[in-house]
């Protein structure tokens, strides 16, 4: 029985993790649960899971929790939520909290000696230079929950340090891969939230549409697998059946295929080395299957290009990139920014940098705050 602490239980990955756990009661048990402010859903999760420890970061939302199961200790506030990431009884901490805020939970889990099942992209995008050395120092274990990195992990025989020639990360291209520049100027939030193949949260769905998300995944792969950026290639694959591939020195390419469902990488990160049947993942080979790949030309997806430039520059610049992206996407979803201006805001913020060597978590917090202020200033001037 794997004992799990789930951080970010009310988001898209968090909800699917709860389903995986409830569908496998003989394999998994959630002993600690934390979320930000979605008190209604959190209340239901408390009743279904009956964790030993639970916390809502938002103290006002926590006041609306009406029923706490017997045996559950419920707390409120950011420190209480952070404590769930190092909860003593947990074997595995799955960090599904969104945004830069997820980094502090990942660091807490690593420092507590927990297995880190990582769904939060920003942990490695912003803090990879801190996180990976810390894992090595602590003798820790990190397991990817992103479908692309889980696919690579599987192709490498579950060995993050296995040798390879090249990593091939697939991308659907998002909802607007075939739109003209003129059509893109008319994109609304409602249009952008309809992803062609994946069911995801709002922020990551917009990042998929701009392809910023794929740039993040390249940065994550660099840190997770020790890959030079020249050995990572992103390719368009509209069908989202091949989740990533690994090319080896002899020319062989190994791929991982399944129907698009996040439940597969979730249950694998929790259950490794065992596998379990996953609802919705199985392909039907009694029917014809076809899929395609095509290169991503520079200039087609400006946010992707900016992300790659930031990746190669390194240091604190990926943290600036992420902060600008979070602010720009929030403004777009709120109706305060055009879809095509997301890239303008990100580029303008990144150009004001700086790209400093990553020294500490506190430095990254300062970088994040500074970049958010710059992005907000740029949005106000548009």
Task: Give names to the regions the model predicted.
Residues 1-382:
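Catalytic, metal-anchored helix/loop core of enzyme active sites in primary metabolism
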């Amino acid at each position: 029985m794997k004992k799990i602490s789930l951080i970010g239980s009310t988001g898209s990955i968090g909800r699917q993790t709860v389903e995986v756990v409830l569908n496998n009661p003989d394999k998994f048990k959630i002993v600690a649960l934390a979320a930000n402010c979605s008190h209604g859903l959190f209340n239901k999760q408390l009743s279904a899971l009956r964790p030993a420890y639970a916390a809502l970061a938002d103290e006002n939302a926590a006041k609306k929790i009406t029923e706490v199961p017997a045996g559950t200790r419920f707390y409120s506030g950011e420190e209480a939520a952070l404590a769930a990431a190092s909860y003593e009884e947990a074997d595995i901490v799955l960090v599904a909290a969104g945004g830069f805020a997820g980094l502090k939970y990942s660091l807490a889990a690593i420092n507590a000696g927990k297995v880190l099942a990582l769904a939060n992209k920003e942990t490695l995008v912003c803090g990879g230079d801190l996180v990976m050395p810390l894992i090595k120092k602590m003798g820790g274990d990190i397991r990817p929950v992103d479908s692309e990195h889980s696919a690579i992990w599987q192709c490498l025989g579950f060995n993050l340090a296995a040798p390879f020639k090249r990593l091939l990360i697939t991308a659907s291209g998002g909802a607007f891969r075939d739109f003209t520049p003129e059509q893109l100027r008319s994109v609304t939030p409602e249009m952008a939230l309809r992803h062609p193949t994946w069911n995801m949260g709002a922020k990551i769905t917009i990042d998929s549409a701009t392809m910023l998300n794929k740039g993040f995944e390249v940065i994550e792969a660099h840190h997770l697998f020790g890959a030079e950026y020249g050995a990572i290639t992103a390719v368009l694959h509209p069908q989202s059946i091949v989740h990533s591939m690994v090319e080896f020195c002899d020319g062989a390419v190994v791929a991982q295929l399944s129907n698009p469902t996040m439940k597969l990488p979730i249950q694998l990160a929790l259950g490794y080395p065992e596998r379990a049947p996953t609802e919705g993942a199985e392909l039907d080979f009694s029917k014809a299957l076809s899929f395609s790949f095509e290169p991503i030309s520079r200039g087609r997806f400006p946010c992707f290009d900016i992300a790659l430039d930031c990746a190669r520059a390194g240091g604190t610049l990926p943290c600036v990139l992420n902060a600008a992206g979070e602010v720009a996407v929030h403004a777009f979803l709120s109706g305060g920014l055009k879809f095509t201006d997301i890239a303008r805001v990100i580029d303008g913020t990144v150009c004001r940098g700086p790209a400093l060597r990553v020294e500490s978590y506190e430095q990254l917090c300062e970088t994040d705050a500074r970049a958010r202020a710059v992005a907000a200033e740029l949005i106000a001037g548009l």
